[in-house]
């Protein structure tokens, strides 16, 4: 049996020798690179300055964490809160990581003394701070690239192909790394004249899988502009970084500081095997090893196979349970559903975050359920929408919002953080928007005093950009169908975010689409285009009509309730009143009296654009691309608006709305129109 031992050790030597032969001491050191981002300054005695100083001072008592990532903040909800993120390289020891972040923070605030946003890269860590929430938000600027070694001249194309192939492979591993660590290291195939390629990629673990992927793609695509075909390359951005060399510069996995180990039972198979081996002689030990190890390997493979099959079965059942007979099920939904699995959140996590959905945390209640404020353990504020368990339409909203918002990334769209399905529970988790919805400001006589023309004009422009993204710039063409003031959320800086995609319709952007029809007419009375309310006919012009209503509501401060009171105009709806005032040259009378400042020409131009959007014929309404041009270019001559929809004889929707419509039900509160399919 002695020859078996010799062969075994010789095989181990052959396996490990190449790695140690190529291992080199990493002398990778560089001077700190400070970046004072030009996005505003603060004064030395401001609230933000105090919060930032307290945050940096608190780092002296920072406790080491297993994953080298720190999400920090200081201040209350007054709007001057300081936020910070720290991240260390994978191989950095915990105490060294804390020391690096402490040093980086102190020096960054000295180098950028009055800058609201800044970032610094040290050899072993990165630290950044901001006056806005940065947790979970991808940031690719500023960037920094370091080049080492010589430029490739021979086999250049082959070199670049292998370089990009390795980085692409590592990107996928890192992006799928979960909420604690998004890191990957590895090597690629050799090319003529070179032994092997080595690389590492890393994202801040607060990013979603898609954001991590996009951040690294951005970095890869910027390689040609600075350092293509370089043997040594290091690239950094606030949210991700990567490194590429032709020598192994990183530690073996076994040499890295391990993640917190799982607790192993005392009577585990490994423990039993160790006990049995210690009671035998030398010859018996070899026999036992030769027998036990293969058995354990076979058992382990069998267990893994069972777990994989069970996981795939649960995954398939879960997918069918969520998709059901959704309006989006089919080729688009099936292909895209896998992208949403990383957004799953445990029900117990949401119960804890919302204090068991306590009434004190309830932000509002709607037709499909309630919305609660919550806080994740790391301090991130969230809004949790808990759908009613007995609402069929609530299920449709749930499916729509998951499948749509998982694809959409835009600053003027609300961001979906996750979702949960457990038994009858259906929950959606969004970013928390501090200032609630537009209707709570614009229709409140006191709160709308806070909205000067600069703020209102920013709202109009932001909503227009969000709709333009949905209609033309996203991967799919999306028609919202329920755009209204209560579905426009306002963040801390009063930027608008379009929310509630439960009624949205999705189409492949490559399809040519003029109008489509539906037998399920749903939306909010007063915002619905006439062709949609009467005949179920919808297109991008349906959203344009709703946008026009919103513009007029924002400027007048009045609700388009079709027959409600507008000052002394008790018998007229809002659109009729504004159009008549336009025709009679008394349009200044419709402007909200609280708008005492601001360009009257700009306000009147926005009213003009709003009237063009609410014209009765969809063909005469502009697209959102044209609306954006109208808002941004005064050289664009506006046509004369025609009579808006729902005036005089059109105030009441005719009873014979459509042969495919079974019935319309309207509630007295906000008059939401819904239709139920035939049994």
Swiss-Prot record:
Domain Gnk2-homologous: 30-134, 140-249
EC number(s) on file: 2.7.11.-
TM stretches of this protein: 287-307
Residues listed as glycosylation sites in the UniProt record: 41, 45, 71, 107, 131, 187
Enzyme class per UniProt: transferase
Side Extracellular, residues: 24-286
GO biological process: response to abscisic acid
Domain of life: Eukaryota
PROSITE patterns in alphabetical order: GNK2, PROTEIN_KINASE_ATP, PROTEIN_KINASE_DOM, PROTEIN_KINASE_ST
Signal peptide, first to last residue: 1-23
Any single Gene Ontology cellular-component annotation: membrane
Residue intervals on the Cytoplasmic side: 308-679
Residues annotated as binding ATP: 363-371, 385
Residues bearing PTM Phosphotyrosine: 430, 532
Keywords: ATP-binding, Glycoprotein, Kinase, Membrane, Nucleotide-binding, Phosphoprotein, Receptor, Repeat, Serine/threonine-protein kinase, Signal, Transferase, Transmembrane, Transmembrane helix
Phosphothreonine PTM sites in chain numbering: 524
Entry membrane topology: Single-pass membrane protein
InterPro entries xrefs: GNK2, GNK2_sf, Kinase-like_dom_sf, Prot_kinase_dom, Protein_kinase_ATP_BS, Ser-Thr/Tyr_kinase_cat_dom, Ser/Thr_kinase_AS
Family from the record: Belongs to the protein kinase superfamily. Ser/Thr protein kinase family. CRK subfamily.
PANTHER family linked to this entry: CYSTEINE-RICH RECEPTOR-LIKE PROTEIN KINASE 28-RELATED, RECEPTOR-LIKE SERINE/THREONINE-PROTEIN KINASE SD1-8
Name of the protein: Cysteine-rich receptor-like protein kinase 29
Organism whose genome encodes this protein: Arabidopsis thaliana
Gene: CRK29
């Amino acid at each position: 049996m002695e020859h078996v031992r010799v062969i075994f050790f010789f095989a181990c030597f052959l396996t490990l020798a190449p790695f140690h032969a190529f291992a080199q001491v990493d002398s990778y050191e560089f001077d700190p690179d400070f970046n004072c981002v030009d996005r505003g300054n603060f004064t030395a005695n401001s609230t933000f300055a105090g919060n930032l100083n307290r945050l940096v001072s608190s780092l002296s008592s920072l406790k080491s964490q297993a994953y080298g990532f720190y999400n920090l903040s200081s201040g209350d909800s007054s709007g001057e809160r300081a936020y910070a993120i720290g991240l260390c390289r994978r191989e950095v020891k915990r105490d060294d990581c804390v020391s690096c972040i402490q040093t980086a923070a102190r020096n960054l605030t000295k180098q950028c003394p009055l800058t609201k946003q800044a970032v610094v890269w040290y050899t072993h860590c990165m630290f950044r701070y901001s006056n806005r929430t940065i947790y979970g938000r991808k940031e690719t600027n500023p960037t920094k690239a370091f080049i080492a070694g010589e430029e490739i001249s021979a086999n250049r194309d082959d070199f670049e192909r292998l370089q990009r192939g390795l980085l692409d492979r590592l990107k996928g591993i890192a992006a799928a790394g979960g909420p604690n660590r998004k890191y990957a290291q590895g090597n690629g195939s050799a090319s003529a004249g070179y032994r092997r390629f080595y690389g590492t990629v890393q994202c801040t673990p607060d990013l979603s899988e898609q954001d991590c992927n996009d951040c690294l793609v951005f970095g890869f695509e910027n390689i040609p502009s600075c350092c293509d075909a370089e043997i040594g390359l290091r690239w950094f951005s606030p949210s991700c970084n990567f490194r590429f060399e032709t020598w192994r510069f990183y530690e073996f996995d076994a040499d890295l500081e391990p993640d917190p180990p799982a607790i192993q039972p005392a009577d585990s198979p490994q423990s039993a095997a160790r006990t049995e081996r210690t009671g035998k002689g030398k010859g018996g030990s070899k026999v036992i090893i030769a027998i036990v190890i293969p058995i354990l390997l076979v058992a382990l493979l069998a267990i893994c196979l069972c777990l994989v099959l069970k996981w795939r079965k649960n995954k398939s059942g879960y997918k069918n349970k969520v998709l059901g007979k959704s309006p989006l099920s089919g080729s688009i939904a099936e292909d895209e559903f896998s992208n949403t699995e990383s957004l799953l959140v445990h029900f117990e996590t949401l119960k804890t975050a919302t204090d068991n959905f306590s009434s004190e945390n309830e932000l509002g209640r709607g037709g499909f359920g309630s919305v609660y404020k919550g806080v994740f353990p790391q301090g991130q504020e969230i809004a949790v929408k808990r759908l009613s368990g007995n609402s069929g339409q609530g299920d449709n909203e749930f499916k729509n919002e998951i499948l749509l918002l998982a694809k959409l990334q835009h600053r003027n769209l609300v961001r979906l953080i996750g979702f949960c399905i457990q038994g009858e529970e259906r929950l959606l988790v969004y970013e928390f928007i501090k200032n609630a919805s537009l209707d709570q400001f614009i229709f409140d006589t006191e709160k709308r005093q806070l909205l000067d023309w600069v703020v209102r004009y920013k709202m109009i422009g932001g909503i227009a950009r969000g709709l333009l993204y949905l209609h033309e710039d996203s991967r799919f063409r999306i028609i919202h169908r329920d755009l209204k003031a209560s579905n426009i959320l306002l963040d801390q800086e009063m930027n608008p975010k379009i929310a509630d995609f439960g009624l949205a319709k999705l189409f492949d952007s490559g399809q040519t689409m003029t109008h489509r029809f539906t037998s399920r007419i749903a939306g909010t009375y007063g915002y619905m285009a006439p062709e949609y309310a009467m005949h179920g006919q919808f297109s991008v012009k349906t959203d344009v009509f709703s946008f026009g209503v919103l513009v007029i509501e924002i400027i007048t401060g009045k609700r388009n309730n079709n027959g409600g009171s507008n000052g002394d105009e008790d018998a007229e709806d809002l659109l009729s009143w504004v159009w008549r005032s336009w025709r009679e040259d008394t349009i200044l009378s419709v402007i909200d009296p609280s708008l005492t400042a601001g360009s009257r020409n700009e306000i009147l131009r926005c009213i003009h654009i709003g009237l063009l959007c609410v014209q009765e014929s969809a063909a005469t309404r502009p697209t959102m691309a044209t609306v954006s041009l109208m808002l941004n270019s005064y050289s664009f001559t506006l046509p004369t608006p025609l009579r808006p929809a729902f005036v005089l004889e059109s105030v009441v929707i005719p009873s014979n709305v459509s042969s495919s419509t079974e019935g319309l039900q309207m509630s007295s509160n906000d008059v939401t129109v819904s239709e139920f399919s035939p049994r």
